[in-house]
C-alpha cells in the first residue's frame, strides 16, 4: 500500500518552536539519509495519526509532498505522547 503525506519545510528549529507546532496540532519531523542533507519538516497530526496505525506503514515507502516536491521516504521512528493518542515527533529516512 502506498501512503502520501503533505508536509512543509520548517523555518524555525528548536524546542520552543517544536512545542508551538505541537500545540497547533502539527508534528515536527526530520528526514535524513546517507549522502543527503537532513530536512526538517512539519505536517498535520491528522495526516499521520490514522495511517501510522496500519501494520505495513513502517515497512512501506511513504511519499512526502514537501512544498510541492515528492520525496520518497521510509518511517524510522515515531515518538508518541505518554497517554494521549498523539505523535510528538517523526523520523524518516530517504529511500
From Swiss-Prot:
Subunit (UniProt): Part of the 50S ribosomal subunit; part of the 5S rRNA/L5/L18/L25 subcomplex. Contacts the 5S rRNA. Binds to the 5S rRNA independently of L5 and L18.
Domain of life, per lineage: Bacteria
Name of the protein described by the UniProt record: Large ribosomal subunit protein bL25
Disulphide-bonded residues: none
Annotated GO biological process: translation
Signal peptide: none
Lineage summary: Bacteria, Pseudomonadati, Pseudomonadota, Gammaproteobacteria, Alteromonadales
Function: This is one of the proteins that binds to the 5S RNA in the ribosome where it forms part of the central protuberance.
Listed InterPro entries: Rbsml_bL25/Gln-tRNA_synth_N, Ribosomal_bL25/Gln-tRNA_synth, Ribosomal_bL25_short, Ribosomal_L25_dom, Ribosomal_uL5_bac-type
GO molecular function: 5S rRNA binding; structural constituent of ribosome
Family: Belongs to the bacterial ribosomal protein bL25 family.
Annotated keywords: Ribonucleoprotein, Ribosomal protein, RNA-binding, rRNA-binding
One cellular component (GO) term of this entry: cytosolic large ribosomal subunit
Gene name in the database record: rplY
